[in-house]
């Protein structure tokens, strides 16, 4: 029978360095006998303090004095000398602080889950009521988002290597032993699983374990794995009514300073799937919004409902309804225009602003914006989008074709006739009826976009393009203003529409602008180069938001 369940230990597998390794190092540093600390922690004393701890019969704070006393008695019995300031609590605090998530192993678990495996964490863990309990809480919070089940010994009253916990795992996952692969860093924990018929992998080092896991599951893990994305079913969804009959849908994760992620055309909150967990883990409250007209947000048909002035006002209302005085606004594509305007017209509500691909382009009050669009060949598709109903019919006819044609890397974006749409009578003219899915998306992800656009249609999203004159007149009111809030511009080398050179004069209007640049990247920056995007954003956010300079910028 084929494997369909993957069970992972926490310490030493999903979290490194292992506590056992730290205890071993401490034994050596204090010149203690081998296994003096490790033996106690590994429950070599049945019904002793550690077994009670792992079964949830006592808490960490109850366990510490018992272990301190046990260690002092053991030291006298074996003639070992403990330092006066010896503290099990301090040793464990240092061990917990040193641990971090083993990203390659987490990526492997995510890849298996994406392939259809049920994934589970099976760990001997404790009820942590210490003053450092937030360390364990943060790790478990992040990991639990990526697994179907979390089985902790302290919650179920059973520990590895007792056989009953493995039976509990099988019952919980509704699996047979020969359908399960189990990974642990202790052979003693694997033996009962192997005796029951599970496939077992002893994790001595991550690389070897992953090679073995690839072999037994028939799954090839990427050499340069992507950040772990969130899925629609694993995030919290919310709604804010910004005016009668109009609501905005958003996805939320994390705590800390608020970040509003704003997507472009034709996208969804889901386009930020690789950024949401990473930014939340970095210490931020992330709100990824379905922009007006998209997905589960309202999509009124009137063109004027999508005027930039109104869209910005509704973003302010969005913040008000959630009780958020200020937020970091990060936008891509059309939402890049929105976030720059938020910084110009509502700077008091903008803690910082960043745009992917879309530069700040102040209007020329002497030249009609439609003339500008007509003068730039690659903007021809925007002229095609102007007539209500025309582009809607083309894009809604076969949405699988639409999204597979749009979401492609810079190397094969030629499927779209962006510079000849009016001449050819469409933006999809000449594209295959059933294009192959690009390497930056999957069939399942394309299906989610289709599902979302079946709710909203393309009328609302296309209406963002149909307020050009109205937006121009409004934006002229900001002529002469400068953006003084912390700001970041991220350019993508191979974006054929929003080219990096279009941003070259931005420092004239944003004197303290920071920059990031991503090579070999096209228009769909967040999903084409998610690791690079995350690195740039988090570095900037930590500098500007979490550790800001005290120097005034005025």
Swiss-Prot record:
Induction: By compounds that cause peroxisome proliferation such as clofibrate, tiadenol and fenofibrate. Residues 257-530 form the AB hydrolase-1 domain. The N-terminal domain has phosphatase activity. The C-terminal domain has epoxide hydrolase activity. Phosphate binds at residues 123-124. Bifunctional enzyme. The C-terminal domain has epoxide hydrolase activity and acts on epoxides (alkene oxides, oxiranes) and arene oxides. Plays a role in xenobiotic metabolism by degrading potentially toxic epoxides. Also determines steady-state levels of physiological mediators. The N-terminal domain has lipid phosphatase activity, with the highest activity towards threo-9,10-phosphonooxy-hydroxy-octadecanoic acid, followed by erythro-9,10-phosphonooxy-hydroxy-octadecanoic acid, 12-phosphonooxy-octadec-9Z-enoic acid and 12-phosphonooxy-octadec-9E-enoic acid. Bifunctional enzyme. The C-terminal domain has epoxide hydrolase activity and acts on epoxides (alkene oxides, oxiranes) and arene oxides. Plays a role in xenobiotic metabolism by degrading potentially toxic epoxides. Also determines steady-state levels of physiological mediators. Inhibited by 1-(1-acetylpiperidin-4-yl)-3-(4-(trifl uoromethoxy)phenyl)urea (TPAU), 1-cyclohexyl-3-dodecylurea (CDU), 12-(3-adamantan-1-yl-ureido)-dodecanoic acid (AUDA), 1-((3S, 5S, 7S)-adamantan-1-yl)-3-(5-(2-(2-ethoxyethoxy) ethoxy)pentyl)urea (AEPU), N-adamantyl-N[']-cyclohexyl urea (ACU), 4-(((1S, 4S)-4-(3-((3S, 5S, 7S)-adamantan-1-yl) ureido)cyclohexyl)oxy)benzoic acid (c-AUCB), 4-(((1R, 4R)-4-(3-((3S, 5S, 7S)-adamantan-1-yl)ureido)cyclohexyl)oxy)benzoic acid (t-AUCB), 4-(((1R, 4R)-4-(3-(4(trifluoromethoxy)phenyl)ureido)cyclohexyl)oxy)benzoic acid (t-TAUCB) and to a lesser extent by 8-(3-((3S, 5S, 7S)-adamantan-1-yl)ureido) octanoic acid (AUOA). Pfam families: Abhydrolase_1, Hydrolase. Its EC number is 3.3.2.10, 3.1.3.76. Gene3D superfamilies: alpha/beta hydrolase (3.40.50.1820), HAD superfamily/HAD-like (3.40.50.1000), Putative phosphatase, domain 2 (1.10.150.240). The modification Phosphoserine is found at residue 368. Its cofactor is Mg(2+). Substrate binds at residue 381. The gene is Ephx2. Residues 1-224 are annotated as: Phosphatase. Changing residue 332 to Q: Reduces epoxide hydrolase activity by 95%. A motif (Microbody targeting signal) lies at residues 552-554. Belongs to the AB hydrolase superfamily. Epoxide hydrolase family. GO terms for molecular function: 10-hydroxy-9-(phosphonooxy)octadecanoate phosphatase activity; epoxide hydrolase activity; lipid phosphatase activity; lysophosphatidic acid phosphatase activity; magnesium ion binding; phosphatase activity; protein homodimerization activity; toxic substance binding. This is Bifunctional epoxide hydrolase 2. The covalent modification of cysteine by 15-deoxy-Delta12,14-prostaglandin-J2 is autocatalytic and reversible. It may occur as an alternative to other cysteine modifications, such as S-nitrosylation and S-palmitoylation. Changing residue 434 to Y: Slight loss of epoxide hydrolase activity.
């Amino acid at each position: 029978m084929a494997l369909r369940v993957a069970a992972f230990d926490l310490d030493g597998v999903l979290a490194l360095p292992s506590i056992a390794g730290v205890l071993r190092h401490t034994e050596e540093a204090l010149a203690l006998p081998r296994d003096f600390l490790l033996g106690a922690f590994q429950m070599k004393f049945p019904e002793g303090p550690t077994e009670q701890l792992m079964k949830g019969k006592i808490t960490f704070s109850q366990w510490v004095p018992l272990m301190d006393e046990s260690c002092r008695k053991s030291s006298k019995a074996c003639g070992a000398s403990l330092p006066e300031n010896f503290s099990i609590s301090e040793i464990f605090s240092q061990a917990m602080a040193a641990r971090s998530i083993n990203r390659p192993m987490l990526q492997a678990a995510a890849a298996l889950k994406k392939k259809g495996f049920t994934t589970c964490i099976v760990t001997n863990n404790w009820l942590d009521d210490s003053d450092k309990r937030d360390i364990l809480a943060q790790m478990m919070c992040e990991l639990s988002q990526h697994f179907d089940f979390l089985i902790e010994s302290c919650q179920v009253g059973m520990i590895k290597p007792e056989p009953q916990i493995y039976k509990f795992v099988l019952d919980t996952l509704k699996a047979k032993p020969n359908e399960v692969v189990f990974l642990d860093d202790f052979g003693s924990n694997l033996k009962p699983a192997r005796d029951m018929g599970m496939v077992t992998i002893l994790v001595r080092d991550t690389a070897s374990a992953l090679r073995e896991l690839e072999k037994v599951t028939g799954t090839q893990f990427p050499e340069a794995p992507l950040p772990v994305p969130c899925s629609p079913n694993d995030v919290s969804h919310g709604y804010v009514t910004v005016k009668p009959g109009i609501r905005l849908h958003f996805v939320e994760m994390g705590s800390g300073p608020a970040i509003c992620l704003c997507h472009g055309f034709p996208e969804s909150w889901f386009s930020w799937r690789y950024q949401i967990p990473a930014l939340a883990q970095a210490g931020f409250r992330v709100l990824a919004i379905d922009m007006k007209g998209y997905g589960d947000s309202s999509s009124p048909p009137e063109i004027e409902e999508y005027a930039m002035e109104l869209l910005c006002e509704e973003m302010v209302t969005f913040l008000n309804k959630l009780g958020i005085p200020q937020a970091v606004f990060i936008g891509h594509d059309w939402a890049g225009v929105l976030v720059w305007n938020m910084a110009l017209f509502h700077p008091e509500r903008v803690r910082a602003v960043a745009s992917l691909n879309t530069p700040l382009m102040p209007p020329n009050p002497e030249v009609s914006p439609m003339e500008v669009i007509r003068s730039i060949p690659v903007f021809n598709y925007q002229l095609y989008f102007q007539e209500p109903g025309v582009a809607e019919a083309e894009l809604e006819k076969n949405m699988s074709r639409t999204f597979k044609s749009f979401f492609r890397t810079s190397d094969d974006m030629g499927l779209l006739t962006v510079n000849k749409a009016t001449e050819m009578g469409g933006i999809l003219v000449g594209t295959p009826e059933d294009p192959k899915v690009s390497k930056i998306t999957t069939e399942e992800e394309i299906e989610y976009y289709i599902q979302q656009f079946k709710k909203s249609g393309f009328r609302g999203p296309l209406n963002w393009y149909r307020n050009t004159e109205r937006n121009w007149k409004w934006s002229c009111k900001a002529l002469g203003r400068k953006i003084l809030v912390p700001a970041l511009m991220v350019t993508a080398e191979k974006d054929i529409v929003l080219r990096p050179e279009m941003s070259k004069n931005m420092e004239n209007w944003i004197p303290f602008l920071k920059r990031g640049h991503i090579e070999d990247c096209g228009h769909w920056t967040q999903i084409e180069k998610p690791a690079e995007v995350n690195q740039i954003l988090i570095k900037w956010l930590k500098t500007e938001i979490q550790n800001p300079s005290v120097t005034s910028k005025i």
